[in-house]
Design a protein with these regions (language model features):
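Electropositive, surface-exposed helix/loop patches at the edges of structured domains
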Residues: 52-66, 112-125
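Alpha/beta enzyme core
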Residues: 1-55, 62-84
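C-terminal extensions of enzymes
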Residues: 82-83, 89-130
Length: 130
């Protein structure tokens, strides 16, 4: 479904792709697959200067989006979150969920002291080096 290892991200970058999606199957098919959010930093370190990184999976709230971007992702996909809104209230539910995500992204950025997306960095979400 998507990249699940740094070596695969390197292969994709070497092949000339413009972006990689870090993804798994949500624990449904293989419960031992790495979480996409946990792959963002190592993949960004390895190939972030050559490809855009998209974090696909595990996004439940705006703070997850902030973490993904701070760690090196260009974008984060939140498929399940909007489906809950769709199932509960149709189009209005999707709008509501997107509003909640937007509010949480803005709140989280304020709490970590990031005024813009460009201000996000790994140090804001991963703590100091030991």
């Amino acid at each position: 479904k998507g990249i699940q290892a740094v070596d695969d991200a390197r292969l994709a970058a070497d092949a000339g792709v413009e972006a990689v999606a870090l993804s798994n199957h949500g624990g449904r098919q293989l419960d031992g697959a790495p979480a996409p959010l946990g792959l963002v930093a190592p993949v960004a370190d390895a190939v972030g200067d050559r490809v855009e990184i998209i974090c696909d999976g595990g996004v439940r709230r705006g703070s997850d989006i902030v973490k993904a971007v701070a760690l090196g992702a260009r974008a984060a996909m939140a498929g399940r979150a909007y489906l809950y809104g769709l199932g509960a209230a149709g189009e209005r539910g999707v709008d509501h969920v997107l509003g909640l995500l937007d509010t949480d992204v803005r709140r989280t950025m304020a709490l970590v002291g990031a005024r813009t997306v460009a201000d996000l960095s790994p140090a804001l979400v991963s703590g100091p080096d030991p």
